[in-house]
Amino acid sequence: MTAENQQNNVTLGALCMCAAMIAGTSIDISVKALAPTYSTAQIVFLRSAIALPLVLALVWHRVGLSALSTAGWGWQLWRGLLTAGASFGFFYGLIYIPLVTALMLAYVGPVLIVLLARPLLGEHISPGRLVGVMLGFAGVVFVISPGSLTIEPAIWSILGSALCWALLSISNRQLATKVSTPVLTFYTYPVSLVIAAVWTWGAWITPAPMDWLLFSVTALGSALAHGFAALAYRYAAAGVVAPFEYTALIWISLAGFLFWGEVPAWTVWVGGSAVILGGIVALRG
């Protein structure tokens, strides 16, 4: 691969991760709106139930249904469990923690990816890229006022979700050259669907008409987020694209202002600038 092609792949990987974060923001907004009424399990169940046939149609159109049988069952079960852990953990946390704060806690994920990429993938993490990730993480820490958080189950739930997401991202990188993106995306849903169905049994609340729209947004946003994230790790190393998960801060801040009238504090803008700078450093590192 020429240096120019390699740089193009890095750029595509970064853009795909940015797109994944935009899609992910739509999920967070919808879940935050649904959480006061519906259980975490029902949200995960309907998200998975709506998304699964959409992604199945994409698999049929792009690579054929036969590709599902060659995806590596052990890996896909592992990825399904990680997806369930990430979904349940983050959605539960959103019930008790403000949206932006939950996102800040979840931002430990990219740092975990960099730390895990070397032992699990054997990827070389250059000093420049490591500095970029740490700079981005420092920006996230700056946004959170010291002493503003207390140790509670919801916080541990978000942090556990971040660990699951980091391991899922690592597995995406491991399988990206072996399994097509539609197939990778498809197998993120069945395990969550089964677990959520069992958990929802006997506690079902029939959604209001407008809430069906929000559930549909969580499904479509989830499919797009998983798809773009898988593409990102296909194009570039985990240590390169991970910092671009921080760009979700921009969209979450805008959503908070547009939908809830929230005006981010100056610390958000300063920390956000550090996050963006960290992404640039990682890209060039």
Residue ranges and their predicted role:
Residues 11-19, 59-60, 64-89, 153-161, ...:
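Loop-to-transmembrane-helix transition segments
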Residues 12-13, 37-85, 164-168, 187-202:
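Transmembrane alpha-helices of multi-pass small-molecule transport proteins
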Residues 21-26, 56, 80-88, 110-115, ...:
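Hydrophobic/small/kink-forming positions within alpha-helical transmembrane segments
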Residues 29-32, 40, 55, 147-207, ...:
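Transmembrane alpha-helical segments that form core, pore/gating elements
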Residues 39-51, 92-109, 151-164, 208-222, ...:
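Structural signature of hydrophobic alpha-helical transmembrane segments
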Residues 46, 102-108, 175-191, 226-257, ...:
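Helix-helix packing/entry segments at the starts of transmembrane helices
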Residues 92, 109-131, 250-270:
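C-terminal transmembrane-helix exit sites in multi-pass transporters
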Residues 128-144, 267-284:
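Hydrophobic transmembrane alpha-helices of multi-pass small-molecule transport proteins
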